[in-house]
Protein backbone atom coordinates (compact mmCIF):
# COMPACT_ATOMS: atom_id res chain seq x y z
CA UNK A 1 0.00 0.00 0.00
CA UNK A 2 1.19 3.48 -0.84
CA UNK A 3 -0.49 6.77 0.04
CA UNK A 4 0.43 9.51 -2.43
CA UNK A 5 -0.39 12.90 -3.93
CA UNK A 6 0.30 14.42 -7.33
CA UNK A 7 1.31 18.08 -7.08
CA UNK A 8 -0.67 18.30 -3.85
CA UNK A 9 -3.76 16.47 -5.15
CA UNK A 10 -4.98 13.26 -3.52
CA UNK A 11 -6.86 12.35 -6.71
CA UNK A 12 -4.09 10.04 -7.87
CA UNK A 13 -6.34 8.04 -10.20
CA UNK A 14 -6.78 11.06 -12.44
CA UNK A 15 -3.06 11.36 -13.16
CA UNK A 16 -1.92 7.72 -13.45
CA UNK A 17 -3.24 4.43 -14.79
CA UNK A 18 -1.92 0.92 -14.18
CA UNK A 19 -2.49 -1.44 -17.09
CA UNK A 20 -1.17 -4.95 -16.46
CA UNK A 21 2.58 -4.41 -15.90
CA UNK A 22 2.63 -0.88 -17.36
CA UNK A 23 2.02 2.31 -15.37
CA UNK A 24 1.11 5.43 -17.33
CA UNK A 25 2.00 8.53 -15.30
CA UNK A 26 1.78 12.25 -16.00
CA UNK A 27 5.17 13.41 -17.32
CA UNK A 28 5.98 16.04 -14.69
CA UNK A 29 5.90 13.58 -11.79
CA UNK A 30 8.98 13.34 -9.57
CA UNK A 31 11.17 10.39 -10.60
CA UNK A 32 11.34 9.10 -7.04
CA UNK A 33 7.53 9.05 -6.81
CA UNK A 34 7.20 7.36 -10.21
CA UNK A 35 9.57 4.61 -9.07
CA UNK A 36 7.68 4.17 -5.79
CA UNK A 37 4.37 3.91 -7.65
CA UNK A 38 5.79 1.34 -10.03
CA UNK A 39 7.28 -0.74 -7.24
CA UNK A 40 4.01 -0.85 -5.29
CA UNK A 41 1.94 -1.75 -8.35
CA UNK A 42 4.40 -4.18 -9.92
CA UNK A 43 4.42 -2.06 -13.08
CA UNK A 44 6.98 -0.20 -15.17
CA UNK A 45 6.35 3.58 -15.21
CA UNK A 46 5.99 5.37 -18.55
CA UNK A 47 5.87 9.15 -18.21
CA UNK A 48 3.47 10.40 -20.88
CA UNK A 49 0.55 12.61 -21.77
CA UNK A 50 -2.60 11.50 -23.59
CA UNK A 51 -3.83 14.02 -26.11
CA UNK A 52 -1.31 16.43 -24.60
CA UNK A 53 -3.09 16.26 -21.23
CA UNK A 54 -1.65 15.24 -17.86
CA UNK A 55 -4.89 13.49 -16.85
CA UNK A 56 -3.70 10.14 -18.18
CA UNK A 57 -5.76 8.16 -15.67
CA UNK A 58 -8.93 9.68 -17.08
CA UNK A 59 -7.95 9.20 -20.71
CA UNK A 60 -6.53 5.64 -20.80
CA UNK A 61 -7.33 2.18 -19.48
CA UNK A 62 -6.77 -1.44 -20.41
CA UNK A 63 -5.98 -4.98 -19.35
CA UNK A 64 -3.50 -7.76 -20.17
CA UNK A 65 -4.73 -7.84 -23.77
CA UNK A 66 -4.61 -4.20 -24.79
CA UNK A 67 -4.63 -0.49 -24.00
CA UNK A 68 -7.53 1.81 -24.78
CA UNK A 69 -6.92 5.56 -25.16
CA UNK A 70 -8.96 8.65 -25.91
CA UNK A 71 -9.42 9.58 -29.56
CA UNK A 72 -7.44 12.72 -28.66
CA UNK A 73 -4.24 10.71 -28.19
CA UNK A 74 -1.58 11.57 -30.75
CA UNK A 75 0.13 9.00 -32.97
CA UNK A 76 3.39 9.57 -31.11
CA UNK A 77 1.74 8.97 -27.73
CA UNK A 78 0.03 5.83 -29.00
CA UNK A 79 3.27 4.53 -30.48
CA UNK A 80 5.19 5.02 -27.21
CA UNK A 81 2.45 3.34 -25.20
CA UNK A 82 2.20 0.41 -27.63
CA UNK A 83 5.96 -0.12 -27.49
CA UNK A 84 6.04 -0.01 -23.69
CA UNK A 85 2.97 -2.23 -23.28
CA UNK A 86 3.94 -4.63 -26.06
CA UNK A 87 0.29 -4.95 -27.03
CA UNK A 88 -2.39 -3.33 -29.14
CA UNK A 89 -3.46 0.26 -28.49
CA UNK A 90 -7.03 1.03 -29.50
CA UNK A 91 -8.52 4.50 -29.93
CA UNK A 92 -11.97 5.00 -28.38
CA UNK A 93 -14.07 6.75 -31.04
CA UNK A 94 -17.02 9.11 -30.73
CA UNK A 95 -17.83 12.00 -28.43
CA UNK A 96 -17.62 9.94 -25.23
CA UNK A 97 -13.95 8.99 -25.47
CA UNK A 98 -12.23 9.63 -22.12
CA UNK A 99 -11.39 5.93 -21.92
CA UNK A 100 -10.31 5.84 -18.28
CA UNK A 101 -13.48 7.58 -17.15
CA UNK A 102 -15.99 5.57 -19.18
CA UNK A 103 -14.53 2.04 -19.20
CA UNK A 104 -14.06 -0.14 -16.09
CA UNK A 105 -12.10 -3.25 -17.05
CA UNK A 106 -10.11 -6.20 -15.80
CA UNK A 107 -8.83 -9.32 -17.57
CA UNK A 108 -12.30 -10.90 -17.54
CA UNK A 109 -14.64 -8.19 -18.77
CA UNK A 110 -15.50 -4.52 -19.26
CA UNK A 111 -18.34 -2.50 -17.72
CA UNK A 112 -18.88 0.73 -19.60
CA UNK A 113 -20.79 4.03 -19.87
CA UNK A 114 -24.41 3.22 -20.78
CA UNK A 115 -24.51 5.70 -23.68
CA UNK A 116 -21.49 4.39 -25.57
CA UNK A 117 -22.47 3.65 -29.19
CA UNK A 118 -22.04 0.30 -30.90
CA UNK A 119 -18.84 1.44 -32.65
CA UNK A 120 -17.24 2.12 -29.27
CA UNK A 121 -18.40 -1.21 -27.85
CA UNK A 122 -16.81 -3.05 -30.78
CA UNK A 123 -13.52 -1.17 -30.30
CA UNK A 124 -13.45 -1.98 -26.58
CA UNK A 125 -14.23 -5.65 -27.17
CA UNK A 126 -11.61 -6.01 -29.91
CA UNK A 127 -8.89 -4.08 -28.06
CA UNK A 128 -9.35 -5.60 -24.62
CA UNK A 129 -10.44 -9.05 -25.80
CA UNK A 130 -13.27 -9.35 -23.26
CA UNK A 131 -17.09 -9.17 -23.19
CA UNK A 132 -18.50 -5.65 -22.78
CA UNK A 133 -21.58 -4.68 -20.74
CA UNK A 134 -23.16 -1.21 -20.47
CA UNK A 135 -24.27 0.10 -17.08
CA UNK A 136 -23.79 2.69 -14.35
CA UNK A 137 -22.88 2.77 -10.65
CA UNK A 138 -24.65 4.95 -8.12
CA UNK A 139 -26.34 6.67 -11.06
CA UNK A 140 -22.86 7.70 -12.25
CA UNK A 141 -22.40 6.94 -15.94
CA UNK A 142 -18.63 7.49 -15.94
CA UNK A 143 -18.10 4.07 -14.38
CA UNK A 144 -14.31 4.32 -14.57
CA UNK A 145 -14.45 7.18 -12.07
CA UNK A 146 -17.06 5.42 -9.92
CA UNK A 147 -15.10 2.21 -9.30
CA UNK A 148 -11.75 0.42 -9.45
CA UNK A 149 -11.32 -3.25 -10.39
CA UNK A 150 -8.57 -5.83 -10.44
CA UNK A 151 -8.83 -9.58 -11.04
CA UNK A 152 -10.02 -10.22 -7.48
CA UNK A 153 -12.68 -7.58 -6.83
CA UNK A 154 -14.24 -4.26 -7.72
CA UNK A 155 -14.71 -1.40 -5.25
CA UNK A 156 -17.70 0.75 -6.19
CA UNK A 157 -19.36 4.11 -5.55
CA UNK A 158 -21.08 3.99 -2.13
CA UNK A 159 -24.52 4.70 -3.62
CA UNK A 160 -24.35 1.79 -6.08
CA UNK A 161 -27.54 -0.27 -5.92
CA UNK A 162 -27.74 -4.01 -5.40
CA UNK A 163 -28.73 -4.51 -9.04
CA UNK A 164 -25.77 -2.39 -10.20
CA UNK A 165 -23.38 -4.39 -8.02
CA UNK A 166 -24.76 -7.62 -9.41
CA UNK A 167 -24.36 -6.33 -12.97
CA UNK A 168 -20.74 -5.28 -12.46
CA UNK A 169 -19.93 -8.57 -10.71
CA UNK A 170 -21.30 -10.51 -13.67
CA UNK A 171 -19.51 -8.28 -16.18
CA UNK A 172 -16.08 -8.49 -14.51
CA UNK A 173 -16.47 -11.96 -12.93
CA UNK A 174 -15.31 -10.74 -9.50
CA UNK A 175 -16.93 -9.78 -6.20
CA UNK A 176 -18.13 -6.17 -5.79
CA UNK A 177 -18.43 -4.04 -2.67
CA UNK A 178 -19.03 -0.42 -1.72
CA UNK A 179 -16.43 2.04 -0.50
CA UNK A 180 -15.00 5.55 -0.50
CA UNK A 181 -11.55 7.16 -0.73
CA UNK A 182 -9.94 10.38 0.50
CA UNK A 183 -12.07 10.80 3.64
CA UNK A 184 -15.46 10.03 2.14
CA UNK A 185 -15.08 10.86 -1.55
CA UNK A 186 -17.41 8.61 -3.57
CA UNK A 187 -15.59 8.56 -6.93
CA UNK A 188 -13.30 5.63 -6.22
CA UNK A 189 -11.51 5.74 -9.56
CA UNK A 190 -10.35 9.30 -9.03
CA UNK A 191 -8.29 8.43 -5.96
CA UNK A 192 -7.24 4.79 -6.24
CA UNK A 193 -4.92 2.89 -8.60
CA UNK A 194 -4.82 -0.90 -8.23
CA UNK A 195 -3.31 -4.00 -9.79
CA UNK A 196 -3.21 -7.59 -8.57
CA UNK A 197 0.13 -6.77 -6.93
CA UNK A 198 -0.74 -3.68 -4.86
CA UNK A 199 -2.49 -0.33 -4.73
CA UNK A 200 -1.86 3.40 -4.51
CA UNK A 201 -4.42 5.65 -2.87
CA UNK A 202 -4.84 9.34 -2.17
CA UNK A 203 -3.07 10.62 0.93
CA UNK A 204 -6.35 11.66 2.59
CA UNK A 205 -7.72 8.11 2.63
CA UNK A 206 -8.59 6.88 6.13
CA UNK A 207 -7.82 3.62 7.91
CA UNK A 208 -11.34 2.21 7.57
CA UNK A 209 -11.31 3.11 3.86
CA UNK A 210 -7.99 1.29 3.45
CA UNK A 211 -9.49 -1.75 5.14
CA UNK A 212 -12.38 -1.87 2.69
CA UNK A 213 -10.00 -1.48 -0.27
CA UNK A 214 -7.80 -4.32 0.95
CA UNK A 215 -10.70 -6.63 1.73
CA UNK A 216 -12.45 -6.05 -1.60
CA UNK A 217 -9.41 -6.14 -3.88
CA UNK A 218 -7.77 -9.12 -2.21
CA UNK A 219 -4.87 -7.64 -0.27
CA UNK A 220 -5.70 -9.34 3.04
CA UNK A 221 -4.11 -12.76 3.51
Curated annotation (Swiss-Prot):
GO terms for biological process: cytosolic ribosome assembly. Keywords: Initiation factor, Protein biosynthesis. GO terms for molecular function: ribosome binding; translation initiation factor activity. InterPro entries: eIF6 (IPR002769). The keyword Protein biosynthesis applies. NCBIfam families: eIF-6 (TIGR00323), PRK04046.1-4 (NF003128). HAMAP family: eIF_6 (MF_00032). PANTHER family: TRANSLATION INITIATION FACTOR 6. Belongs to the eIF-6 family. Binds to the 50S ribosomal subunit and prevents its association with the 30S ribosomal subunit to form the 70S initiation complex. This is Translation initiation factor 6. It comes from Halorubrum lacusprofundi (strain ATCC 49239 / DSM 5036 / JCM 8891 / ACAM 34).
